[in-house]
Amino acid sequence: MKRRLILSAIVFLAGWAAALAQLHFWALKAESRPSENPTPADIAVVLGNSVNRKGAPNPCLRSRVEAGAALYRQGLAGGLLMSGGTDGDGSNEAEAMRDMAVSMGVPADKIRIEPRSESTYENIAFSAPLLHDAEQIILVSDAFHLARAEWLAKRHWPDKTVRLHASGSCGDSTPNYLRKLSREILAWLKTAALHR
């Protein structure tokens, strides 16, 4: 019985390690995608993240907004759609992202907001009605998050062409990065089971 328990634990840990390695590989692949002769998109959808982290502005959210704003300023996105709901402290992700983008030089009239979503599935589903006039879309998020976001987008936006753009590093420590990858594994399991 004890031997079977140990073997089960080893198999579980090996599977978990393999899943972490796969997510890290996808993240590296997303970060290194070539951007030679990029085609402009109609809009970039920037996926939300909590506004504050440990009482301070979240650098990971800012990194996503910076990536979206850069796409707009470079003429690679005709506008931005900020997608994110209200955090536990009452901060709304989409509104905070819009304000950040405006401070980075993106005109307010080039920014749409989807302020209700509380998950990646909802980011994609709730953004769909706001994308009725867009055919070419760039999804912006952390590199490790993009594979799942793309999987969901292809199911909810079948008539759209979706490309991916990884935001820059937000200074995560290795333990924090591994925690995020572990959380992403659980999110993939939920997505696979529920298609959400």
Regions found by a protein language model. Name each.
Residues 23-181:
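A structural signal for short, hydrophobic/glycine-enriched beta-strand patches
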Residues 174-196:
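A transmembrane-helix-recognition feature enriched in membrane-embedded lipid enzymes
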Residues 1-2, 62, 181, 188:
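Intrinsically disordered, low-complexity sequence elements enriched in Ser/Thr/Gly/Pro
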Residues 18-25, 69, 189-196:
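Structural signature of transmembrane alpha-helix termini at the membrane-water interface
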